[in-house]
Amino acid sequence: MKRVLAALVVALVAALLFYGYYSRSDQTWLLCLLASFPGLLYLVWQGMPRPSSETNRTLQRLGGTLIACFMLISVHLLYQQVVAAPAIRLKIGSQGTDNPISDPRRADAELRVRRGRIFAAGGQPIADTTVLPDGYVARSYPNSYTGYLAGYYSPLRFGNFGLENLYDDYLSGRKGNNPLLEAENNLLHRPTYGSDLYLTLQADVQEVAQDALAGCGGPQRGVCRGAVVVLDVQTGAVLAMASNPRFDPSQIAADPASDPKAERDRITAYWNGLVNDPSNPLVLRATAGRYPPGSTFKTVTLVAGLDTGKYTLTSPFTDPGQVSLNNQTVYDCTTCRPAGTGPRYSLVEGYKWSLNVVFATIANDLGAGEMAKYISSFYISRDLRADFDLATSSLCSTAAPTDIQCILSGPEAKNLNVASSYGQGQLQVTPLHMALIAATVGRGGELPRPYLVDHISQHPTSEGQPGRVLQKTSPQVLTRVMTPQTASTARQAMYTGVQSGWANGAAIPGWVVGGKTGTAETGRGTNHAWFIAIMGKDAGSPQYAICAMIENGGEGSSYAMPIAKRVMTYIAGRK
């Protein structure tokens, strides 16, 4: 009977300790630890020999109690030193809003790590580490055109952001190194080396895109706000991802060789300037900016109409300039309809001249269910599973970006379905996502997963040999959106837009270019300017997908398309 009871007590004590351990709560752990003490005490007492006298019994129980207490303390110390050690090491207290308190040894150790570097596709450094004479290291970002894409590294002030945060375990050496070698290095006080990131980013294309954005013009005054994205159509690799305005991460990184107070004041002043800047330079518009896409989204509606088999490029439409659908009047833009044309148009004419009435008619005819299926298949309101920070494009303006019910049910559903067909309604899409939609058409109907990190490698050896590759990105297809035949037809519509439509200013000699302009109404102020394009040497196999977007830029053909044209011209001229 005693053995059965002892076994039950052991099981109870183990259950309490395991529950406290997996709760990851200090309070729960301590309560479970205290609750296990009576059982632990019982087991210790049961394991002792029977005393020969009452005095021995008292001494024995006192000794058993002390043993149980020491066992309890030992278990708690083991928990603190092994399980909770990382959390304790990173814990930050406060003596008021401006006086954070943390373990200085953690900060000291962090500033001595040979943090991994970040490189562009051609080997150009995006983020680098310099070892100072006293053993500390300084983080630097040599190229202002690409540095902000790494994010920022500020462990003592503002934390990490972007790639510096997402890949911190690799960059700091906590992941990817040989555990035995790390233990030896710690024992012998050798420095820890982080792993290096190699990106798909092409630094020269990024610089051209950034320069084009800096002088984007437009009716707005002050800082030009916008984004340019260039993707490899066949793989989904990000070749350029420019945003304007941008921040300088080197101004946030501390220099350990400088006076600590002066550095703190300098960094704080720069940070406060960023936070208070009305142009929001901390928002990377290529990936975090979400906007109504305007007529560029007619590409999605075009695909839906073609892929269902209900329409061809020659399908006729009657478009007198406006149409009433579901008690809502849809208008063509006043400058879209070329003089002397209409009211009969084919679908390809509606696309190249960006006629809202044509695409509203398609969406209304297909119905919200069919439209929602194609919009969702392009991963609108879905996670693209990118390997970098990327906002989720959304169909509905609800708290959950994955919600698509606004066009399926409710009093405004039919109207929102129609408005979404030409890129208005509640649609909010990132520039990168619009580039991906163009890439999907260019790739034959398959939606590629966008990625920025080509591979992660260990730090080179002391003999100068390249480090071991820890992780290599393989291109992935997220889904097939349309048939190859539909994709070929949609590409032809995009090519026609450049050959004889409003995108004719994007033509490049010797290259096959397809494009779609967009002018998105914002409901307040000037419209957003958009342009998406595909380009290649062969009409059947485009190589690049491009998106340019200018906040409050005005007409897409006047302000976004010239920026994309400048980037495409550079790409076409490279050897």
Per-region residue spans from a language model:
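Periplasmic/cell-envelope proteins involved in peptidoglycan metabolism and beta-lactam response
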Residues: 1-266, 278-290, 312, 369-376, ...
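Beta-lactam-recognizing serine transpeptidase/beta-lactamase-like catalytic domain environment
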Residues: 3-5, 11-17, 234-295, 300-552, ...
